[in-house]
Curated annotation (Swiss-Prot):
It comes from Methanosphaera stadtmanae (strain ATCC 43021 / DSM 3091 / JCM 11832 / MCB-3). The keyword Phosphoprotein does not apply. It is found in: Cytoplasm. GO terms for biological process: pyrimidine nucleotide metabolic process. Gene3D superfamilies: P-loop containing nucleotide triphosphate hydrolases (3.40.50.300). This is Cytidylate kinase. ATP binds at G7, L8, A9, G10, T11, G12, T13, S14, T15. It comes from the Archaea. Pfam families: Cytidylate_kin2. Its EC number is 2.7.4.25.
Length: 173
């Protein structure tokens, strides 16, 4: 079974993917893992590769292609990434969401930054990603039609979120 888990920064995609992976004993990869692997392959630090990727659409395309290839060569895998659902032939596509203020609080705590700074960064990052995904892939990240399940992670804690996903997977047609 191939499962994708996507969501904007601070919605809990990494935590959910890791926890689900442990509970159902299916490995997971994240877009971040693949990005770090690509940095190593290009003999760059993560920062150098990030800066290189900013001006090079081919990096985004290669990252998406790599995730799809890994998933296509796997029988069971959880793929975590903002737009992985659009590139991976998944059995189940999940989108996690949370209000902007909740996302900002989570990131502020995780990264030990001021809430105001994080709110500004989230606004800029979301606008940048929205524009980039549309320009590079013709993907509107606000259109959630591709997803089988959408969960508000402000409403449910991690345990409940994972339980909802497990129940839905068990009952999928």
């Amino acid at each position: 079974m191939i499962i994708t888990i996507g969501g904007l920064a601070g919605t809990g995609t990494s935590t959910t993917a890791k926890t689900l992976s442990q509970e159902i004993n299916i490995p997971f990869i994240s877009a971040g893992d693949v990005f770090r692997q690509m940095a190593v392959e290009n003999n760059m630090t993560l920062l150098e590769f990030s800066e290189f990727a900013e001006g090079n659409d081919n990096i985004d395309k290669a990252l998406d292609k790599r995730q799809a290839e890994i998933a296509n060569n796997s029988e069971n895998l959880i793929v975590e990434g903002r737009i992985s659902a659009f590139f991976v032939n998944a059995d189940y596509r999940i989108w996690l969401k949370a209000p902007d203020n909740v996302r900002a609080e989570r990131i502020s705590y995780r990264e030990d930054k001021s809430l105001d700074t994080v709110k500004q960064e989230i606004a800029e990052r979301t606008a940048s990603e929205r524009k980039r995904y549309m320009e590079i892939h013709d993907i509107d990240i606000d259109n959630l039609d591709i997803y089988d399940l959408i969960i508000n992670t402000d409403t449910f804690n991690i345990e409940s979120t994972v339980n909802i996903i497990k129940k839905c997977i068990e009952n999928k047609k």
